[in-house]
């Protein structure tokens, strides 16, 4: 989430239970917001354990291996979304603290179970309305559509997040800041997010009576569907009761087809993040009339002049059964290459967050730039773009430069030498490929 520095240990038992919101007030109550652990960061190991388990079970049970290109794109979006947290405390908590410090009306006790449970309900209620508006207000959808852009539905999809979305969500939690201490809010805003990880799976079917109260994989599959019956439904975070109360609940019926109604057809991370912002910009200037221009921003993504606020249901593309996910086939060695370099990138990413307080601004900026370049280059490779080889050559050269001048460091013995050898080989291989492709393009022009 960014900005949490609490050093409280999270046991293995607590780590597992926090993924399902099964923790007790007496073990997750803190007097000061600075004492609240960064539960999301501590959950990283559990994310990957659950991801690996899902991959194994899905492959062994259903014969459905993970699509590496789509899965890595989702993980890339998760990395992308957290980069602003290197420099800034999470805007949700920072804005909450400001209101609490300046405008609170009463101060509920931070160590009361009643405060804990009230905050649980308040955060989940705020999330429901934020999530609903993120689908019903076009400018907010620009931040949320990233999460819906995957055409697969698995645990990697849960990590496909937008770096823009957090700048809209904070206002929906403001009312609690008039009475609920920031430390209690900071706990629940993290647990609410963590709970939503495990429901992104096709491996769990109906959960019986729990389906009436909790948001479950079945309910959330509907939310991610692009079938007409799935659109604008099941906004719950933890409790599905809000959808039942406000008329947005839809049960799972026919097989769900996942993704956007108009697929983006790319694995390039910047397009995954901002393609709808570009669409809004172009539509804004192409739409006549000032009031219509405002409607482009503040009405639904499906709105157009003369249409209802949320657009016309009949314009939602029907499912024919012939739909195929965007999937340019990559050779097995390229998929292994992508996974290997993403794991190497994660080491850079994790170290940057751990050492952000002692790294110089120049080092932080260079590492952020390298991370974004790596994510982009992997996207180019999986998209099979013409300049992929050239971009990957530049990326590998940049890594060697950064390591040589100590902008990339490691505490692991011999890893520096291994990196130097690996990236030198990659530079040569991709460089040769880039030269060969350039020669072939030149011949075609002659």
UniProtKB/Swiss-Prot annotation:
Q: Motif range for Histidine box-3?
A: 220-224
Q: For this UniProt entry, which segments traverse the membrane? A: 43-63, 110-130, 167-187, 339-359, 362-382, 412-434
Which keywords, in A-to-Z order, does the entry hold?
Endoplasmic reticulum, Iron, Lipid metabolism, Membrane, Oxidoreductase, Transmembrane, Transmembrane helix
Principal place where this protein is found? endoplasmic reticulum
Catalysed reactions, as listed in the record: 1-O-(1,2-saturated-alkyl)-sn-glycerol + (6R)-L-erythro-5,6,7,8-tetrahydrobiopterin + O2 = a 1-(1-hydroxyalkyl)-sn-glycerol + (6R)-L-erythro-6,7-dihydrobiopterin + H2O
Which Pfam families does its entry note? AGMP_C, FA_hydroxylase
Q: Which cofactor does it need?
A: Fe cation
Q: What is its EC number?
A: 1.14.16.5
Please indicate which superkingdom the organism of origin belongs to: Eukaryota
GO molecular function annotations of the record: glyceryl-ether monooxygenase activity; iron ion binding
Please report the record's description of how this protein sits within the membrane: Multi-pass membrane protein
Query: According to the UniProt entry, where does the motif Histidine box-2 sit in this chain?
Result: 144-148
What's the stated role of this polypeptide? Glyceryl-ether monooxygenase that cleaves the O-alkyl bond of ether lipids. Ether lipids are essential components of brain membranes.
Q: Which family does it belong to?
A: Belongs to the sterol desaturase family. TMEM195 subfamily.
Query: What protein name applies here?
Result: Alkylglycerol monooxygenase
* Protein source organism: Xenopus tropicalis
């Amino acid at each position: 989430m960014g900005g949490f520095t609490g050093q409280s240990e999270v046991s293995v038992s607590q780590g597992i239970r926090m993924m399902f919101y099964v923790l007790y007030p007496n073990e997750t109550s803190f007097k000061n917001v600075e004492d609240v652990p960064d539960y999301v960061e501590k959950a990283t190991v559990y994310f990957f354990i659950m991801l690996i388990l899902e991959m194994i079970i899905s492959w062994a049970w259903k014969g459905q291996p993970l699509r590496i290109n789509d899965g890595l794109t989702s993980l890339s979006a998760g990395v992308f979304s957290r980069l602003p947290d290197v420099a800034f405390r999470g805007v949700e908590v920072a804005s909450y603290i400001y209101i609490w410090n300046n405008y609170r009306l009463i101060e509920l006790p931070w160590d009361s179970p009643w405060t804990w449970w009230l905050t649980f309900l308040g955060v989940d209620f705020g999330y429901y309305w934020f999530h609903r508006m993120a689908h019903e207000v076009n400018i907010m959808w620009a931040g949320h559509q990233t999460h819906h852009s995957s055409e697969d539905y698995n645990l990697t999809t849960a990590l496909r997040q937008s770096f823009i979305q957090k700048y809209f969500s904070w206002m929906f939690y403001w009312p609690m800041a008039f009475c609920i201490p920031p430390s209690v809010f900071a706990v629940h805003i993290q647990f609410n997010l963590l709970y939503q990880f495990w429901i992104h799976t096709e491996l769990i079917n109906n959960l019986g009576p729990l389906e009436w109260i909790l948001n479950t994989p079945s309910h959330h599959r509907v939310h991610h569907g692009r079938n007409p019956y799935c659109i604008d439904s099941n906004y719950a975070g933890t409790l599905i009761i809000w959808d039942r109360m406000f008329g947005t609940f839809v049960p799972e019926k026919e097989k769900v087809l996942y993704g956007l109604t108009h697929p983006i057809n790319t694995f390039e991370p910047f397009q995954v993040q901002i393609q709808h912002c570009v669409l809004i910009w172009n539509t804004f200037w192409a739409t006549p009339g000032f009031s219509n221009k405002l409607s482009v921003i503040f009405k639904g993504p499906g709105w157009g002049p003369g249409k209802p606020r949320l657009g016309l249901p009949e314009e939602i593309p029907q499912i024919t059964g012939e739909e195929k996910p965007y999937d340019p086939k990559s050779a097995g060695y390229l998929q292994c290459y992508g996974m290997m370099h993403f794991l190497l990138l994660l080491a850079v990413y994790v170290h940057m967050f751990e050492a952000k307080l002692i790294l110089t601004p120049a080092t932080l900026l260079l590492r952020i730039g390298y991370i974004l370049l790596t994510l982009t280059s992997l996207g180019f490779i999986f998209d099979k773009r013409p300049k992929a080889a050239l971009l990957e050559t530049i990326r590998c050269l940049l890594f060697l430069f950064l390591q040589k001048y100590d902008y990339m460091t490691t505490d692991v013995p011999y890893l520096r030498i291994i990196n130097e050898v690996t990236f030198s080989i990659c530079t040569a291989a991709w460089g040769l490929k880039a030269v060969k492709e350039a020669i072939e393009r030149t011949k075609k022009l002659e």
